[in-house]
């Protein structure tokens, strides 16, 4: 897009306002590079990108980007063998820190609001590399100003020696300056430093009383700064240690620089992404300041800007206008009084197009629609005086000639006071001819004029619409309201009457104008009245729509509250059911405990009625519809004695011993014999049943294939393990996982010793790494 157009539309001022919202030189650099795109996909992507960040910015407190800075020069220097200093390393550390903070913020945002998606920002977050190691390497080695003493063992030793030597020097010099005999010989009883050597200030006349080296003197020459000979060697030692310190610091910084070079590509990606985020957040901040909205871009040519206003004007006083190229309209001609807002309307349209194609939200109400223009051409400038009319006309015409050379069907052309600066009749003729030419090219055009001839232009050409800026004859001032579809009319008679001109003169003047012109003015006046009526109705419609939207929002909230209430009722019901299940589980444990005791008593008979009574006690705890399995049994031939069946309610196999009646049968499940409903039985193919003394009844309560004993006391853990193994056997599990944790190993040892002795366990082993490692024991059941 032409720079001249951007200058005329004052796009640089918009960029300056966006630049003020950036935090870093990275963001500022991107603002300075910001230009309107002309590719449709690029324009749409840039707008979506800004809108995503704006949505987040308007709802949440973003993490600070303070301290973010451009570090690519340091990274490249590190890559070619240079050594970075502490300050440069800290800027790189801050870049990583800002990245990590933003990534953490985004992850929390996504977790908290799973229903909202930010695909573009999500992609940027996925681009960010992991640089945790480099961050810690820098962070643990240096602070803001220098390397830590413990940055290396060698550095710590050197600095310790420097500190102890300095302390000895200070003690020696303190004795000298505090000596009563030396008080009158010293300019001041202090120890100071000259040329990196510890010295004392001695009066010049007492120089001979102090053996040592003079390093400096005062401006008056009255004071000499002497390094006493007693500390010369210690100061020399400090100098040597400082040299060693510098070498060690250089070594450490070289090592850290090597780490930076190794992560060069990752750091450059981080810099690019974080700079882009700073740029986008600056766009979002600026957009909020103008209450910007996201336009919808369309492939077909369209312009609809509801209640648009110029973003550089005071929003509290500027009049917002709806600018629209209605269907099949390619040219809009605005007429009306000077200083009525015609030029501002042109600039508003042009600047909003440029902003939108630069990825900035635009100052309109929601629902704006735009197409993407390859170029915007402007001939906009203030009128000059009559003495300058020739230069004015020549300047405009030179610009128009240049526009006509390049404009095409993908262009928006803005003409301000087209044909002005020359003879009115010739100017009007030129204006109409230029408009015809641009329409033939296929460009979208908005032009302002004060030529009355152009009012009739739209009535004999298709695709042309008149518009005007309103003038209030009562206040004798423009209202700055744009009236689409209504041409401007002369207000000379009304203004003259308002100013007190005689009615006789006004009426005589009216007789002097042509009938056609009089009829046109009356028609325009009628159009203005109709436009105001329609506008009033539209505002009322907007009000009703907003009320309807509010009602819809209220109903949606109430519906959501109802759903939440319904959910809470369901959760409450589930909780009650779980309490019953818990009671049933305890009852089942008691039954299993009884069965185990019966099984361990040699020769003890299991009384059927006792088992049936216990089963009934368990059944009483279950809700028929919500807890029992709703199993559709398969259809087979009629069940008879001797058939092998599956008991649906227990999930166990059994053999039919006797058909009691049409509804009940006696079934043997292992050592248990029970009377069951026939509808609870599913006929299976005959299989040879292995003789066993184990109880194979399955608890209806489904158990997991793993038991977590972490946190249990030793004795309680073994009791829990016993009960679990019994339930696992009844559930026909072949293998189970006992989680005991690593800890001291006492619980692991106790569990494995117990498994060795347990009758239901055939084998066990330690867990594989994928299964939990040493914290898990895997038991195989018989």
UniProtKB/Swiss-Prot annotation:
Subunit structure, interactors included: Homodimer. Binds to stalled ribosomes, contacting rRNA.
Name listed for the protein in its UniProt record: Endonuclease MutS2
GO process terms (BP): mismatch repair; negative regulation of DNA recombination; rescue of stalled ribosome
The keyword Hydrolase belongs to this UniProt entry's keyword annotation: yes
Gene that produces this protein: mutS2
Organism of this sequence: Staphylococcus aureus (strain JH9)
Stored SUPFAM superfamilies: DNA repair protein MutS, domain III (SSF48334), P-loop containing nucleoside triphosphate hydrolases (SSF52540), SMR domain-like (SSF160443)
Gene Ontology molecular functions: ATP binding; ATP hydrolysis activity; ATP-dependent DNA damage sensor activity; endonuclease activity; mismatched DNA binding; ribosomal large subunit binding; rRNA binding
Sorted UniProt keywords: ATP-binding, DNA-binding, Endonuclease, Hydrolase, Nuclease, Nucleotide-binding, RNA-binding, rRNA-binding
SMART domains per record: MUTSac, MUTSd, SMR
Any Pfam family hit: MSSS
């Amino acid at each position: 897009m032409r720079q001249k157009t951007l200058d005329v539309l004052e796009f640089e001022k918009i960029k300056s306002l966006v630049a003020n919202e950036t935090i870093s030189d990275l963001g500022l650099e991107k603002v300075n590079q910001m230009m309107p795109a002309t590719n449709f996909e690029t324009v749409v992507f840039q707008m979506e990108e800004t809108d995503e960040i704006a949505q987040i910015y308007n709802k949440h407190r973003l993490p600070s980007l303070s301290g973010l800075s451009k570090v690519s020069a340091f990274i490249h220097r590190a890559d070619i063998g240079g050594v970075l200093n502490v300050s440069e390393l800290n800027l790189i550390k801050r870049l990583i820190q800002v990245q990590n903070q933003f990534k953490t913020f985004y992850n929390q945002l996504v977790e908290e609001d799973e229903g909202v998606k930010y695909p573009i920002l999500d992609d940027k977050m996925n681009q960010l590399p992991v640089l945790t190691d480099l961050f810690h390497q820098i962070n643990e080695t240096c602070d803001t100003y220098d390397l830590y003493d413990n940055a290396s063992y060698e550095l710590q030793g050197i600095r310790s020696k420097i500190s102890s030597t300095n302390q000895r020097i200070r003690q020696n010099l303190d004795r000298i300056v505090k000596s009563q005999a030396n008080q009158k010989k010293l300019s001041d009883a202090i120890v100071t430093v000259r040329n990196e050597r510890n010295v004392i200030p001695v009066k010049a006349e007492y120089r001979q009383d102090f053996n040592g080296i003079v390093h400096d003197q005062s401006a008056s020459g009255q004071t000499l700064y002497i390094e006493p000979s007693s500390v010369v060697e210690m100061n020399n030692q400090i100098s040597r240690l400082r040299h060693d310190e510098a070498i060690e610091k250089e070594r450490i910084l070289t090592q850290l620089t090597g780490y930076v070079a190794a992560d060069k590509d990752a750091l450059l990606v981080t810099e690019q992404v974080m700079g882009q985020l700073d740029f986008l957040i600056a766009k979002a901040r600026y957009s909020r300041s103008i209450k910007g909205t996201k336009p919808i871009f369309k492939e077909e040519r369209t312009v609809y800007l509801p209640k648009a206003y110029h973003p550089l004007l005071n929003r509290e006083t500027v009049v917002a206008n709806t600018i629209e190229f209605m269907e099949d309209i390619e040219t809009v001609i605005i007429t009306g009084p000077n200083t009525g807002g015609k030029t501002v309307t042109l600039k508003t349209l042009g600047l909003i197009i440029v902003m939108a194609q630069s990825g900035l939200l635009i100052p309109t109400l929601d629902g704006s629609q735009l197409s993407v223009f390859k170029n915007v051409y402007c001939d906009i400038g203030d009128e000059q005086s009559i003495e300058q009319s020739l230069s004015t006309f020549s300047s405009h015409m030179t610009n128009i000639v240049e526009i006509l050379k390049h404009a095409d069907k993908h262009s928006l052309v803005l003409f301000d006071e087209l044909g002005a600066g020359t003879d009115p009749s010739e100017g009007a003729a030129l204006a109409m001819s230029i408009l015809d030419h641009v329409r033939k090219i296929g460009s979208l055009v908005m032009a302002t004029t004060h030529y009355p001839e152009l009012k009739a232009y739209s009535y004999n050409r298709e695709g042309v619409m008149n518009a005007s800026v309103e003038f209030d004859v009562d206040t004798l001032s423009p209202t700055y309201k744009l009236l689409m579809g209504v041409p401007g009319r002369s207000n000379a008679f009304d203004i003259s009457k308002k100013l007190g001109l005689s009615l006789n003169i006004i009426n005589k003047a009216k007789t002097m104008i042509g009938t056609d012109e009089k009829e046109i003015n009356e028609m325009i006046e009628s159009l203005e009245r109709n436009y105001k009526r329609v506008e009033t109705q539209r505002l009322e419609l907007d009000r009703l729509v907003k009320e309807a939207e509010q009602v819809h929002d209220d109903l949606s909230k109430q519906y959501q509250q109802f759903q939440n209430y319904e959910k809470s009722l369901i959760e409450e019901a589930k909780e009650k059911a779980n309490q019953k299940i818990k009671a049933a589980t305890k009852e089942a444990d008691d039954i299993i405990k009884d069965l185990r005791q019966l099984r361990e008593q040699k020769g003890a008979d299991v009384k059927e009625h006792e088992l049936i009574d216990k089963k009934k006690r368990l059944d009483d705890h279950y809700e028929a519809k919500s807890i029992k399995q709703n199993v559709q049994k398969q259809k087979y031939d009629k069940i008879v004695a001797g058939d092998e069946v599956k008991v649906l309610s227990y999930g166990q196999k059994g053999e039919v011993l006797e058909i009691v009646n049409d509804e009940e049968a006696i079934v043997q499940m292992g050592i248990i014999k029970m009377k069951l409903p026939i509808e609870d039985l599913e006929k299976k193919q005959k299989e040879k049943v292995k003789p066993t003394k184990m109880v194979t009844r399955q608890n209806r309560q489904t158990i997991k294939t793993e038991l977590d004993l972490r946190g249990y006391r030793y004795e309680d853990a073994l009791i829990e393990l016993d009960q679990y193994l019994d339930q696992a056997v009844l559930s026909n599990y072949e293998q189970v996982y006992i989680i005991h944790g690593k800890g001291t190993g006492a619980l692991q040892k106790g569990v494995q010793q117990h498994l060795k002795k347990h009758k239901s366990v055939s084998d066990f082993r330690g867990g594989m790494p994928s299964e939990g490692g040493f914290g898990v024991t895997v038991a195989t059941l018989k």
